[in-house]
Amino acid sequence: MTAMTALETVRLLGADQQHILTRAQLIEHGVPSGTIAHRLRPGGPWQRVLPRVICLQSGRLSPHQRLRAALSYAAPKGERPRPGSVLLTGLAVLAEAGLPSAGHPSDVEVVDVLIPAGRRVASRDFVRVHRAPARSTGMPAGFERDDGLWSVGVARALADWAPFAAGSRQFRALCAEAVQGRHCERADLLARLLGGPVATAALPHVQHVADELTCGIYSVAEGEAREVLRRAGLPEPLWNPVLLLDGRFLAVPDAFWPQACVALEIDSRAWHLRPADYERTLTRGNRLQAARLPVVRATPHQLRSDAGPVVRELRTLLATGPHGPYHRITWTRARG
C-alpha cells in the first residue's frame, strides 16, 4: 500500500471517528512514521492532541472530539480503543446528558475517564484518569452512546465527579436534576455516593446530598427550605410524599405535615426543568386547596431573604391542625 493510498484509507476511517485516531491506528493502516511526522509539523494539516492521539484536522477540537481523544489516550498503549475498555465519566457525562447545572458540553474543561485498576495511565492535559476499584465488580459495564462513545451512567458520573466539585451548591443541584429528570434512580445514586471510596462518602457535600436524597428532597430549593424550617424549630415534614384521598391519588406536595394536614409548595420556574413542570406545581396546589387542605406558598427568594411570614403562617397552621378531611388522607413515600 502506498502512502497516498494509506492516507485515503485513514481519511475514511477518520470520518467515522470524528478525525481522531491513535498513532497505532495510523501505523496499522500503512501510514509511514515519516508521513505522520511531516503532517504533524508546525502549520501542517494534522495536530497532536495528546500523547499517541492525533487529530486529522487543524484548529480547535469540538466537544465530541475532546471526548473521543480522551478515550483514545486512556486506551492500552499501542492498541486500538476497545469498546468498553475505557469509559467516560464525570462532568462531561452530566453535560452531555443535559443536566442544566453541568453547563454546555463545550464549557467542560476537564474530561474524566474511568479505566480498570492496575492500568498505568496518568492524567494529562485536559484528561483526568479515574481507576476502578481492584475487585471483580470494580469496572462497570458501561454503555455505548448514540455517538459510539462508551460511558458510565449518570449516577456513577456524579460519584466520580464528587471529589472535584468546586461548590456544594452545584453538586446538590446536579444530584437533584439527575433524580428529578429521571436520569437515574434515587436509590442507585445513593448507593454510588455512599458505596464508593470512603474518602468520597465522607465529603461534607456528599453527606449533605445523601441526607437530602434519603428524606426525599429533589431540588436545591427544597433543600434550602428544609434548612429554613430547621432553623425556625418547626417539625420535620415529609418531602415529596404521594398523598391519597380516600385511597385515590391527590397530589405530591413539596413538603407535608401529616399530623396537621398542612402542605408547603415552593413556587419557582428556576427549579423546574421544563415549563410543564412549573404548571404541574400550580395545578398540584390547586388540587390540595380544592380538597380543603391548607397550602402555604413560598418562593426560594422569599425563603432566603424574608422567611419570617412563611414560618409564622406554618407555625400557626401546625398549631391549629389537623385541617380539612385529615381522616381521609393517607400517604406513601416518594418514588425511589
Model regions and ranges:
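Short gly/ser-rich loop at a beta-strand->alpha-helix junction or flexible surface loop bordering the NTP-binding
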Residues: 1-202, 238, 319-336
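Surface segments flanking catalytic/ligand-binding clefts of nucleic-acid enzymes
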Residues: 2-4, 31-32, 179-336
